């Protein structure tokens, strides 16, 4: 067997130190962003003026607006967006807080009742000769870790939103000095969010494990069963963040586009459009706060899944701390690798032209993957015993440390492949999107047909990538292999999030430039940043969906072993009915979220039309629109509409587990995983392709694009219709599906002891 080279003390120092370095790096990047001043006060001395960058660039007065006014205007708009986003999140968190308390009580009652709230120790499920802590302890600690995960998730989302709204106007102002400066500001702000989230998630989990260990001592099984609540808390908050934020952002977006662009023929982000502030707020609450919570949830769950599966392995039974915390050590090294990778974008290379933006972001993915592969090899060598035993459904499996390294590496590279395939299908630099744009010649119908076909086709390679990584990792290390493969895919989360958050920040920067009446040249620069951000956002969604599939499977494995099922037989009717119902759930969920966006957008369209018709001088630009009403419509609609889809996901495992038992529930989990992944990938890519086909026609960068006509042509109108249909697909139902897949699995895992003892009431009666 042989113990790990890295001593336990080394592990206990390494993990928190890496987390603290991550947080320090995030604060340092934030400090650099904050050096861009949003006040228009000039220093008297010429040296100070040079230092503040006033002499770096010529102030463009093409629009007759002097520098002072532009800065003040940008600050005002930024303030409005920040206030809108903060008020939405506080309203959302009020409702989510009530849910958290109610669900925490439920966890305590269900898990406590497993042994009738007894406080005496019980025989362990994996080894009857040993005694484990009572179920009541698991109930209390699971409840605490659920609340911890939930709060960490909410804080992550909120901080991300604050950073994004802090950086958007600064990116706009930097765009006056050139595209390179604006890129660095947007990217640094994204990095602040990425590192804060990754380091926070790791640190809180590590502290929780150490505090719980004081009580649990050597009972790893009980300890990590209780820690699973952390993943459940993180993901259930992410569900409301993603669904609520997604409905908010798309209701505003669709409403603003339909009335502004299609009916009134005014440009995007025109300050005369009443829904324009709501649209920009939506970018922050959906694409930043929602996405941050989502990836944090995946991160927490993949760690929990790996720890639960490992707790009944040989190093779990021999109490080897370093080997046990291998998943956390991988994440710690991930933070250091991402730190190095970020410096490539901000310090080692400079962006001088528009065409260098997208390659720079893609390089981030490649560099982080290559460096991480080396990092994981080192970690596997020092933190694992040369060989160890994993118990898989009652069967022992001997695993070598190099095999576990391959499991992590396979997940890591599968993530990169999924990212690049997504980019190929959604970037307008390649033929798939250009074909979709070309199909607009014959109207919106052919555009929709081509877009749907593209989405379905884009599922093929990612599914093979996921399938191969599952096969390889399962062959080498059973369910533990799959859990660490998911962790491998998420190990470069800090870089992934930085790239992801960069998109909405640039999008907002463009909106602010338009509203502040800045020159055409600046708008072109922010548009170029935004177009690259659009593709990288699609790559980010690919990562989130791919990792969700692996995480869900790992959680499924942990659930099956916790619920003491030895085999899941598809031929038994109990399992098969679960399978069919599970496969239907993603469709039901998508129907709810799509309809919610539609009905919220209807209200928005009516309000925007009402303002254009009743406010005199609005179209001429002499009167100000009532932005606040539109923000309120989006807020109210999204809060009301996020409850039914949320209830569907949270209640399904409970209802199925209690009424039909663990076998049917295992069928439901497998079914939802299989169909959910396919719909999520195709929905995200279809929406992304329609969006970029529209941008391709608008930019008119190539001969082919120019032949499809300028803005306002029939081709362009057909493209706008496709884009509007794709909005809820790519930003609401697609990305929320990966939470459905993971959340049902992690919830089943948390409640597994209860379902195993009290579940299947219907089958007991009949």
UniProtKB/Swiss-Prot annotation:
Residue numbers binding substrate: 250, 730
Intracellular or extracellular location(s): Vacuole membrane
Disulphide bond pairs: 124-132
Top-level taxon of origin: Eukaryota
Keyword hit for Membrane: yes
Residues in compartment: Intravacuolar: 2-8, 115-135, 217-219, 313-320, 383-401, 473-478, 564-573, 661, 759-765
Reactions this protein catalyses: diphosphate + H2O + H(+)(in) = 2 phosphate + 2 H(+)(out)
Protein's job: Proton-translocating inorganic pyrophosphatase that contributes to the transtonoplast (from cytosol to vacuole lumen) H(+)-electrochemical potential difference. It establishes a proton gradient of similar and often greater magnitude than the H(+)-ATPase on the same membrane.
NCBIfam families registered for this protein in UniProt: PRK00733.3-5 (NF001960), V_PPase (TIGR01104)
Further facts: Has few direct interactions with pyrophosphate. Interacts with the substrate via divalent metal cations, such as magnesium ions, that are bound to the pyrophosphate.
Protein name: Pyrophosphate-energized vacuolar membrane proton pump
